[in-house]
């Protein structure tokens, strides 16, 4: 056996290089797994791509165990008692007593009788009167079920002069009583030492925070608080929102103390605030942490900013914007003790310098990152120059991700967050509630999807109070306070009930009704697609000129007509139309069983009557429906649909009042008769009127439209049904109307009222009583509006029951509120505020994607009109025309069809069909399953998803057995003669066979005989 060769040794230099490369890869991998400080600029690129629909909507998940659920308040905003028990004056007492501080947008409060009430106060002298209502406030906390309560101590209440002299015992007793009550409830306090209310004596003596000496006085005040309250407090905030204190207190003068100094003074004040904070943190860390075991930080406010364009320059400007607001204070504390480079480069002559010892003193002086995010800074007090020409955005999730990357993954406690409503809004604060939902949802996504370490959330605020420069013109509380009342009772708003339920669930846990359902529809379920107006193109694909031509090959090189020679004309065929076959091919690719489209009344009858009938167009429609039948696709044809121009009516009818004219109803019946005669042999599903726009239609027009529908229905029922055996109805748009505040009875009443006006107006006469809804009539009478016509008894009988099925179009869900919040979206006529849940997914056209709304609409229709056969004759969404994947449509179709399945399987709705909207972008841009450009149709990816649902007849899970449905074959409409005469045909066939056989035998033997005699 030969000896084994010794192993080859790698050169020493190569080993060193490989080792270096390995270490480099490990380093790069580590940086990818956890970005180093200062990497916040990556955030914009990370969120630049639009997320998949599943990640854009509501995330059904819960917060980590031990998550801190808090609510907050500030002393000056809520305490009142400005002269009680020895309290000293603060800069806000002085500032608000000056007329300049009265907000210009203070609301005029009206009594129930309509008379104006006395004007609201313009100061915080009484505010919510928390100083005299400790038990009331803490009962509010108990109702909410929070784990933590953030409040601030009034410096001037415990030290009236601001300096460490004899403290105010009554002030100390008030806070001790509050802390004791919190302990009884099991609620942990989060205490802010300074929330903008500096003792006026310190402002007068030292010039406020512009004097560096104030840092020492702040340290003394903090030491007093730590000594008296520290045993019960585990979370301390030194200063709230130093940006606002420095910039708007001492530079712009918009807030107390109202110093309109230079920007240099603003930067100097911020410098002193940072030193003051660091002194207090060092004091606690050295003298109190060992025995009290608490944590100390500073509450930093911030906005979020997005680039106008995704370029390096605009991203740098966004980074600079955050540096100038949040980084101004966060970088010295959380990184290196110094200001951001962008500030130092741009403000070299204005920005004070830290000494090296001060940098070391400030650096690391926070035990967690306390974040304030809300309207006060983000959208009201952000200086325009600090946006750097970029765009503000209320995206808390992206800000949390930026902080996580920029400041080395700190623990983040959101210590202030919320929104606001108008000062006239009472307890149904839907806008605030949905912003609260949005921010909490974004916090959850930051935790679960982005890995950000968010440890707590604080809703702002516990109760309505004095809102700084806005006075009482807005409200931010979870509890309503009547500032003109004596007792100042706290009344829970819808937002409080929502927050209480959310805390109880620890987030948004998956619910059974949110889970997709596995199952199938019945075998005869109609799977369709919609194209509101098919392209009527009567161009023939074959050469139809009857003349004969010769090719002049020697001279002109042209065709020369031969005079007197004409070819025989052939009968036209449907296959000659070049526009029909491509559309049939598209439908076959989708594998739909039904196709809905609308006829063009004005095209068929240009004059509105049968004195002039466009036979070419009528022949095209006849060919279209017959070819659909031959392709085993059932046509569903609408006689009329509102469209431009002239509402889709013949011009002659439009110029004479359109549907305002009762003659239009008679003309419609005449037009329907023509269509039934010409197309009824192939069409078995008719829609008289498709999606009449009830919101843009007068009551008189709706009255005539209902009679037109009924006339057409009875015409078909009496004259054509027996022979054609079709079905006919009207298709109404039924978008779901949901109460904005689910806890509000008034919102429920408003939602029902809007549904009756939107849907019941036309549905109740047909599917219900034969007359208009009582709700509608009563409301109009209250409004002294007597324009809604009355039906005669004969008309009621004519209209009632004029249907064979209930057809509805459904696209979205709308929230309604009775409180007037946004004048632009407020309907004074119905006294309803329309809005949307900002956590909902939206299309590019801002259509909300709310799948459960379809199920609710179907159940409401059954509740109102009984167990009728229903068809969803249109359901779809627009998409981004530039996106390769129409992922929104895939998500939309899948989830809406699944809700339809729930309605059928779980609720027992007699649902017979579903039609997706729409076939192509040709007639409705951005809404089709096919892109259309340069006369070419390109399928979008969503077609495969819809086709899969059709093939499965629903949703088949791993353990779901599909329902066996026998294959259906095309019915030959001309085969009846043969089916009924089988015996005769067999006999004739036998005779023909015998005759042919005899001829063959005669021919054979005659040939054989001739050969024999040759």
UniProtKB/Swiss-Prot annotation:
Residues 517-955 are annotated as: Glycosyl hydrolase-1 2. Residues 1005-1014 are cytoplasmic. Present in cortical renal tubules and the parathyroid (at protein level). Strongly expressed in kidney. Expressed at low levels in brain, lung, intestine and ovaries. Its EC number is 3.2.1.31. The chain crosses the membrane at residues 984-1004. One of its GO terms (molecular function) is beta-glucuronidase activity. Contains 2 glycosyl hydrolase 1 regions. However, the first region lacks the essential Glu active site residue at position 241, and the second one lacks the essential Glu active site residue at position 874. Belongs to the glycosyl hydrolase 1 family. Klotho subfamily. This is Klotho.
